Swiss-Prot record:
It comes from the Bacteria. It comes from Shewanella amazonensis (strain ATCC BAA-1098 / SB2B). One of its GO terms (molecular function) is rRNA binding. This is Dual-specificity RNA methyltransferase RlmN. GO terms for biological process: rRNA base methylation; tRNA methylation. Belongs to the radical SAM superfamily. RlmN family. Its EC number is 2.1.1.192. Its cofactor is [4Fe-4S] cluster. Signal peptide: none annotated. Reaction proceeds by a ping-pong mechanism involving intermediate methylation of a conserved cysteine residue. The gene is rlmN.
Amino acid sequence: MSEKKINLLDLDLPGLKALLTEMGEKPFRAQQIMQWIYHFGVSDFEQMTNINKAMRAKLAARCEIVAPEITSYQKSSDGTIKFAINVGQGQEVETVYIPEDDRATLCVSSQVGCALECTFCSTAQQGFNRNLTVSEIVGQIWRVSHFLGFQKETGERPISNVVMMGMGEPLLNLANVVPAMNIMLDDYGFGLSKRRVTLSTSGVVPALDKLGDVIDVALAVSIHAPNDELRDVLVPINKKYPLQEFLAAIRRYLEKSNANRGRVTLEYVMLDHINDSTDQAHELAKLMKDTPCKINLIPFNPYPGSPYGRSSNSRIDRFAKVLMEYDLTVIVRKTRGDDIDAACGQLAGDIRDRTKRLAKKRMQESQISVTMN
């Protein structure tokens, strides 16, 4: 049985240098190899013309460059593109490309499904299967860059920003997310600045503390409620790490970080008559008084079977005005890609749920139906 080849997309620069040293090659070759992979989009060692033939043969014998394949894509009327990415065993994750006048953002997934159970999120309703590997995370960027055209082909960087806001909770896959973000930041990798790579979390406090010790990227936090009572329902991990504990961890991260320019991005999905009253806006403003932040108000994007509705524009406007009375920076996020179910909270993919969450939900619904009949 032949030895499984090492996928170079799984290795950040230190990892690739260590591999080359173990192979008896000079570590500086790692920079050259990474440039071929991430700047030129090369997956064939024979195309790496500044590496000698013997080394190319040695690499081909032990290594490979394999990214997950795009199985399908949909393009929205606003230019947003949602990609279905095959990660094996009949499973898919979703990745979303969002073009704007001054940037091109890719929303990247970190897990097959999600281990958290946020009640307003379509991904959460699908259950959870596993963490994505480093190559499956950076492979989303690599594959979409191929689709759009690499910088060396087009003269322009196809993706200027990456947000870890796709399927999954990134901090529950820290071992793979950190090396993947290292590749995003590395000048020999995708070469993005630390302010252009954003990790979004629902509040895994111990992992957030670890994150601040190993990497500096922009941080976004999913709050969605102004108090623990409501957040326990909307974001159940709050029962383990309540708001004050989460906010303290955010402040600790900000003390270590330069990428955030001293403030965190707070995400707050607007659910009609659930978390969008003016009283709740006052409560949220007071909650955040000691945590420097920019607040993104996100109109809820309904999905089939969702128990919530989207707040009206007038309720969102009133909520925003209250927050601004406290001198808070508030942005009402423009919904992108909702006509192809690519908007915030709508990503679902194709998941073999190991938690049996979806099956349990369907059984409960059928039992309710039988009782009512």
